[in-house]
From Swiss-Prot:
Key word DNA repair present: no
Identification of the protein by name: ADP-ribosylation factor GTPase-activating protein GCS1
Alphabetical keyword list: Cytoplasm, Golgi apparatus, GTPase activation, Metal-binding, Mitochondrion, Phosphoprotein, Protein transport, Transport, Zinc, Zinc-finger
Gene3D superfamilies per the UniProt record, alphabetical: Arf GTPase activating protein (1.10.220.150)
Name of encoding gene: GCS1
Zinc finger (C4-type): 26-49
Composition skew (Low complexity), residue ranges: 138-151
Provenance organism: Saccharomyces cerevisiae (strain ATCC 204508 / S288c)
Cited function: GTPase-activating protein (GAP) for ARF1 and ARF2. Involved in intracellular vesicular transport. Required for transport from the trans-Golgi network. Implicated in the regulation of retrograde transport from the Golgi to the ER and in actin cytoskeletal organization. May be involved in the maintenance of mitochondrial morphology, possibly through organizing the actin cytoskeleton in Saccharomyces.
Listed InterPro entries: ARFGAP/RecO (IPR037278), ArfGAP_dom (IPR001164), ArfGAP_dom_sf (IPR038508)
Amino acid sequence: MSDWKVDPDTRRRLLQLQKIGANKKCMDCGAPNPQWATPKFGAFICLECAGIHRGLGVHISFVRSITMDQFKPEELLRMEKGGNEPLTEWFKSHNIDLSLPQKVKYDNPVAEDYKEKLTCLCEDRVFEEREHLDFDASKLSATSQTAASATPGVAQSREGTPLENRRSATPANSSNGANFQKEKNEAYFAELGKKNQSRPDHLPPSQGGKYQGFGSTPAKPPQERSAGSSNTLSLENFQADPLGTLSRGWGLFSSAVTKSFEDVNETVIKPHVQQWQSGELSEETKRAAAQFGQKFQETSSYGFQAFSNFTKNFNGNAEDSSTAGNTTHTEYQKIDNNDKKNEQDEDKWDDF
């Protein structure tokens, strides 16, 4: 990739031209120290006016930065042969109002003739001005309002207004605009608040509910709370779904070894013994309890058998050790006590 950079000699010559006479101010708005140029007209313009020229189209005008862009030799020659003062005199001699919008001022037969004149001057040719019988420069003022409405807002604010007057009017205009925008924002947020008050409270905002602040979540509906407690063993769940409640109780017992029989007896069996004896429970409830008891007895028998085998192996290993006699005897007593306690639990279930 080639190393592109601005020719320092070209930039120096352009900066020197910019400091001569009328070139010190923008051709269109009069802003001081213009840093852009339109080579087709050989004039110096400011940054904002350069943006307007860019929107006119390259067939009318194109712009270059006198410090950041590279100029072709013929473009640099047009800047040297032209200038803001010759262009101003040409417009005035042909009754072109300098305060007209750029679209009107540079897109007409008089402006085209000046570009042709500048080209002939650079090429050492004789310029012959053409006659435009159907063109009336005085009618450009009547069409300027229509052209201004199609021009960007920056152009409208700059047309025919001295720079000093615009700067002095800026604080008041900005203050009025800020007050109007503030009132508009307050009305908008007040309308949002009214709409939020009409939203339901039991739904999240994503589903059309009310916004209640950052981090807030609506309370769970009653059916969700009841669904969360349906997995626990309680009197209400047992009455509503006896078979499902006992099945869930059996699953909890099978998955957690630390869940003792006393917990199941206290939470499920004892509260319903009286209802069982009085015949208030249905036949489905009795069948569910019988199935639960049978599964519990089978699993508990298997567990007791496995535990007995474990204790036998533990006893055989303990007899081979002569250094832990007293400790082993104490462990035997704890195991026997646990066996008796498990047998008592099994007897309770058989009685039930």
